[in-house]
Amino acid sequence: MFSRRSHGDVKKSTQKVLDPKKDVLTRLKHLRALLDNVDANDLKQFFETNYSQIYFIFYENFIALENSLKLKGNNKSQREELDSILFLFEKILQFLPERIFFRWHYQSIGSTLKKLLHTGNSIKIRCEGIRLFLLWLQALQTNCAEEQVLIFACLVPGFPAVMSSRGPCTLETLINPSPSVADVKIYPEEITPLLPAISGEKIAEDQTCFFLQILLKYMVIQAASLEWKNKENQDTGFKFLFTLFRKYYLPHLFPSFTKLTNIYKPVLDIPHLRPKPVYITTTRDNENIYSTKIPYMAARVVFIKWIVTFFLEKKYLTATQNTKNGVDVLPKIIQTVGGGAVQERAPELDGGGPTEQDKSHSNSSTLSDRRLSNSSLCSIEEEHRMVYEMVQRILLSTRGYVNFVNEVFHQAFLLPSCEIAVTRKVVQVYRKWILQDKPVFMEEPDRKDVAQEDAEKLGFSETDSKEASSESSGHKRSSSWGRTYSFTSAMSRGCVTEEENTNVKAGVQALLQVFLTNSANIFLLEPCAEVPVLLKEQVDACKAVLIIFRRMIMELTMNKKTWEQMLQILLRITEAVMQKPKDKQIKDLFAQSLAGLLFRTLMVAWIRANLCVYISRELWDDFLGVLSSLTEWEELINEWANIMDSLTAVLARTVYGVEMTNLPLDKLSEQKEKKQRGKGCVLDPQKGTTVGRSFSLSWRSHPDVTEPMRFRSATTSGAPGVEKARNIVRQKATEVEECQQSENAPAAGSGHLTVGQQQQVLRSSSTSDIPEPLCSDSSQGQKAENTQNSSSSEPQPIQENKGHVKREHEGITILVRRSSSPAELDLKDDLQQTQGKCRERQKSESTNSDTTLGCTNEAELSMGPWQTCEEDPELNTPTDVVADADARHWLQLSPTDASNLTDSSECLTDDCSIIAGGSLTGWHPDSAAVLWRRVLGILGDVNNIQSPKIHARVFCYLYELWYKLAKIRDNLAISLDNQSSPSPPVLIPPLRMFASWLFKAATLPNEYKEGKLQAYRLICAMMTRRQDVLPNSDFLVHFYLVMHLGLTSEDQDILNTIIRHCPPRFFSLGFPGFSMLVGDFITAAARVLSTDILTAPRSEAVTVLGSLVCFPNTYQEIPLLQSVPEVNEAITGTEDVKHYLINILLKNATEEPNEYARCIAVCSLGVWICEELAQCTSHPQVKEAINVIGVTLKFPNKIVAQVACDVLQLLVSYWEKLQMFETSLPRKMAEILVATVAFLLPSAEYSSVETDKKFIVSLLLCLLDWCMALPVSVLLHPVSTAVLEEQHSARAPLLDYIYRVLHCCVCGSSTYTQQSHYILTLADLSSTDYDPFLPLANVKSSEPVQYHSSAELGNLLTVEEEKKRRSLELIPLTARMVMAHLVNHLGHYPLSGGPAILHSLVSENHDNAHVEGSELSFEVFRSPNLQLFVFNDSTLISYLQTPTEGPVGGSPVGSLSDVRVIVRDISGKYSWDGKVLYGPLEGCLAPNGRNPSFLISSWHRDTFGPQKDSSQVEEGDDVLDKLLENIGHTSPECLLPSQLNLNEPSLTPCGMNYDQEKEIIEVILRQNAQEDEYIQSHNFDSAMKVTSQGQPSPVEPRGPFYFCRLLLDDLGMNSWDRRKNFHLLKKNSKLLRELKNLDSRQCRETHKIAVFYIAEGQEDKCSILSNERGSQAYEDFVAGLGWEVDLSTHCGFMGGLQRNGSTGQTAPYYATSTVEVIFHVSTRMPSDSDDSLTKKLRHLGNDEVHIVWSEHSRDYRRGIIPTAFGDVSIIIYPMKNHMFFIAITKKPEVPFFGPLFDGAIVSGKLLPSLVCATCINASRAVKCLIPLYQSFYEERALYLEAIIQNHREVMTFEDFAAQVFSPSPSYSLSGTD
């Protein structure tokens, strides 16, 4: 025997204990020593051997102490002695239970315990008495008498007296019973308190709760204290006590406690709404405490807490942790005597206990009391761990106990709000059972023990049970959990009343059903809205329950019965909680707090259930009825919208194969994503585990949770249902046509759909408008199991994104068969085809099978509100990090055993989803389509919603939903590799599905205005898209009616909405009868523009008007269906509409306050003028339009003025049409420009705004274009002015005024201020047809947007300084260029070489005998026949003497050399050749030393007319006369205005009278006479005579620069006066480089434009670039853009094209004297190899402006042609009526340009010229964004300036003369001159 003392000590103590001679106190002392030092087993043996003496020692000492206490009172030593005696008493009870069981010392022990239990004792003694009494009672068990049972029933004060055979009993009457007979002489001694309570003792305020806690705790702690020989009796002790407790206490604690609760056959009646109890408010520590008057409520709470303790995770404490702040928590007597068996102090005992309570047992609690923490409820001493586990095992050991526990928990759900914190603990227990550690009774019953009928009643199919059993197999219990114990012996003694049934397995489903039903009571308690604290408590508890519901939905396999119970419970809860109070003023805070979460849970559960089991139509009808009655809740609308978003994502994936988070177009738009994850709709296998997130609703937020993939076998259902569905499909095929008559009526709450109905939705008739609810017929292929996961049943990790993420605008859609007529609906073939496609898609998808739910990346599709309702922090225990942490993907399949994974080949190929009557679970095309359709209509008819705000919210969401449908449509049949175009999709979304709702909404009363506006917005969006299938006539009739009502509505907001959202695209679609709305649109746009509201859609209105300007000429009779302002009756006819339309445009071009709208109005007028000129209609308002455009040139807003300038520039190409319209109009245009420049110049010169100067430049260039286009005769015509002053009876020609204004631009506007009529003024333009002072209203100018890259920012300061410097010189520089251009090209251009050649191609090395190279080289500078000069510091002039090859150019006299002058100035490079005009004839001497004269002709100008060689000159011919005649013929611009030849005498001047003639003759005769007289008088004067000289012999000039010097002499360049303006250049290598660089620069503005042709069905670059020809209309258009030039010989701008044919043989080219445009036409370039395609793409893609001619049925996407350029795309869509719709897309930083605008519609005649002009302006707009961009002449000016500054040579006159005499002295020959 092991002990802490030596063997000898123990033996001595034993002897002394057993020595009867020793006094009892000594024996007690040695007995205590034994108890402390001997093991329990030896002690039991010792006690059983010496039980009598031991008891004697105890009893004698106890009696002695009792007497001592009565005599001496209470002191410390006696209390310690009492502790020692009671310790011995406890050991007697513990070690001798078998003897006590047979009533050993029955009366003595009973008497002793009564003394301890006496109510007069102190609390500590009473607690110790209860503990020891429970030990005794456990030992007695069934052998106890009625008295002991009654004492147990009375241990807790406050309960009613217990009825017995002696009447009502209390603890007092049982301890000291009153004598039954009054005169009896013998009666028991009165039992008095052992240790009476002292006056200062602290007493619990609620003694009922205090002693109930003591009783319950000791029932557990003492349960295993007795040392039975038969260990099984340990269980029976607790069971005996617990049975007594249930018999005597439970009826008072739970008056409504029912024994009918049975989770094995559960009663699932849905609870009813309970009224709230009356709450009593008391105050403690300045905190309100709420309680009810319900009896024993506090005790009831205590008992529920006690039960909960056994099922929550417990916190075990060591003995040292049982102190609080250094003070013992419990009475010391209990700690010492009880050997550490400390009862846990209840929360109510902390902090001094509760306040005074009345005797009605009303319970009370504070907020901290309600917020029970795990530690306060479940903290247990470590040494009691085993006994708590034993009691827990007992409570789960039989069906009776299991049912009892569940009924207690049921009662907990019925607690009032003030005690609902306890309910939350019960919820936590259920959460643990359901989601974590399943108790034994939740295991599935063994098949052999359960009849098949029971299984059917539970709603299990064979597959379900297998899944559930496989699920539960993962929850292994420790050995202590599943044990059962036999109660046979106990029952034979009558202490156990439960039926022995240890097979407690009920299965998961039963508990889920019971929990669902019972937990509803929390919601169905009327909330206490007036007490916010209680309301919050109830809300939190409800949220905790909903969290479990969510987890059940997400993670658990539930059978049909459980799903139906959940749906019914959720429906009833929703119906009860969300009913709005009748008084609208009262806010239902409870409902508001739960609304979002409750609606979300309901909807998610509904959809999830339909994926797993078949839900009846009746339930769907209930669902519809409940939700449609709650549409006044905005939260419902929000959650419905969220669910629809997720359903749409699933629909997109399962039906259309489009991932909303990974859309093809999104991928293509990201240039960085070069590696495609797959082709078509194949998903990345590596993303398998994240597929299916669209319906997750962010229920998952824990990143470390792994989730096993779930599968359900599809082989368990038979084919009869499929055959039935097929028959319905065939039957429905005949009904399609009838369905067209009721297009798009969204059935509210469509019930169960058959496959046939689903089929119909997929197919759609020719309307594609989905007349019936939708479903997919392509589910057959969806049974393929996930190939990646089928190989392994291991969980796949899921990466989650936490938080609330915004919802993207994704697309959604439903299935629509592309078809043109019902006759094409071969349903059988389509069914097979679709099934095959789906099977193929499923095999290729990784996780995108029926096992997963939705989209990839949940973060992008989540509906985060799940996470907005935070769980109670106390729920987040260490084992349960987040309540929502491991929620599975919502709407996912149930888990199955890995053995159930089957290959798709094993599945029935004709099976369909559960919702369609099949057996496939999860997402398939049919289930996705049906659920999408049903949930869409679950709110009922949305037009019946009463709240206008909610109604508007619904229609706002419908627009978002439609946008997603449209997005899906846009992403169908997209080429991902951009190498080939997919075939058109079989299924297309029904974009007109909402039409019936929208049409009805448009007719609602005005209080639903917001919803109406949203409806009109969606109608416009719906009908301005390209239609895959044209709507039928009935639909169009409804549509036109609604639009007519809207366009003619008195409500300005409706007008604004339609005009804003119905762009001109509508007119381009060409619906039958669309022109009937043209008049309505014009009127509506006019009404929008007539308002003063700047926020109105003014630009959209002007765009609509501008798009219609060509319609009146195309449609001869356009009706105006409504009377218009200024007209009393409805009007029809072309002219009336045109007149009305143009008047509106004219008005808005002058008065429109919106800048962008004003620009479009001006452009529209320009397009209309061109249209009228092209059609030769001679419309009288053309002059008005020109007047408006001309006046707009001086408008202060330079953006608008620039547009007007562009329009005037456009009209240059129509000058002949203008001249035909009115002869003076072209000249008037130039006059307007001249006068406008003169008007704006003074302010622009000194303006600090760069745009002012740039606009003057634009005007000058436009003026130049007009000058170059108009015939010289028009420019030489005198200007036309309204009032001519007498002294100026004849005005100067227009060209003179042009040069004057240019001179003013160069020299400054002050030049003409002192001279009257020096320039043309605006007043001079005034006439009956033109008002130069037409008033213009101001516009609200837009702020210029600055776009700077980060790299540019550092240089901004430098850039701005340089810009400022240049802008000062910009106007003079431009004017100089214009003058130089006019001087060189007016009347000359185009030259004989064609418009491609503007400047000379000749250089100094050509025809130079002293240079051998073909290129300009330094050798040239050493030539003795070349000298380079600078003239006026602005022009470079090269003089070159070249050998002649005979008389050229019709020169009558030849010479050995010619002179060539090469001029380089700001406007270009020019070359002139000179011949000696007059010199010695061939073979003759030169006459008398006369210097030869020169003929100078343009080098590149051919000679026309009669030519004669000098050898043909006959004797007597006047050579000079012949020369003058030849010049007049070859250069008619040299003729005088009289047009007489140069060799003809001028006409006699008129106006000389006879007297004047006579006087002149007399003067001449007098002069002659005087001369004769002088000669005669000096004839003989020798001084007057000179010696005669002989004629010198002529010498042939051989100097290499001789003739050049002669020409310089003729020009006066060698004179002293010219020295300051005429200099030499330094000849060096730098100059050579500069000259080469200068010659390489363009002398015109150049643009290169790409032209693409897109045929029908082409959506990839390879197909588009491979087109070698286009349609006839396209070819005609390209031919109209310019002239087709041969690239191998083309001398103009090439734009990078090659001459070797690698980029094509020809290209369209357009040029004026100022602009060159080359068109890179894709169909002109070869595409016979990959290299050719690459080269073609490189040329086309590098252009900034793209013209796209698209004949495809879908809109052009910029990304099809991958390029970083293409800043502007002008897309041309041919229309059915031979007009063309223009769409212009540009980068946001590109400024506005015209004349075409986005949305313009033009006729074929105008198209080429307008597109060409727009391209040029677009290219200019793009180039203006380039920092420090320079025009061609600015560039030339800078180069010239640099050359002159760096290479001009300053020298003396002598040196200069020497250089002119001999440019290269080493070559000079002496005596040559």
Curated annotation (Swiss-Prot):
Positions with biased composition (Basic and acidic residues): 445-469, 801-811, 825-844
Tree of life domain: Eukaryota
Subcellular location: Cytoplasm
Region of interest called Disordered, as start-end residue ranges on this chain: 341-370, 445-481, 734-856
Cytoplasm is among the record's keywords: yes
Residue ranges constituting the Rap-GAP domain according to the UniProt record: 1635-1843
Positions carrying Phosphothreonine: 715
GO annotations of cellular component type: cytoplasm; cytosol; extracellular space; nucleus; plasma membrane
Transmembrane segments: none
Biological process, per Gene Ontology: activation of GTPase activity; Ral protein signal transduction; regulation of exocyst localization; regulation of protein localization; regulation of small GTPase mediated signal transduction
Biased composition (Polar residues): 755-769, 776-799, 845-855
Positions of disulphide bridges: none
UniProt keywords, alphabetically: Cytoplasm, GTPase activation, Phosphoprotein
Any one GO MF annotation of this record: protein heterodimerization activity
SUPFAM superfamilies, per the entry: ARM repeat (SSF48371), Rap/Ran-GAP (SSF111347)
Residue numbers of Phosphoserine PTMs: 373, 376, 379, 486, 696, 820-821, 1593
Summary of subunit composition and partner proteins: Component of the heterodimeric RalGAP2 complex with RALGAPB. Heterodimerization is required for activity.
UniProt function note: Catalytic subunit of the heterodimeric RalGAP2 complex which acts as a GTPase activator for the Ras-like small GTPases RALA and RALB.
Record protein name field: Ral GTPase-activating protein subunit alpha-2
Native source species: Homo sapiens (Human)
Protein encoded by which gene: RALGAPA2
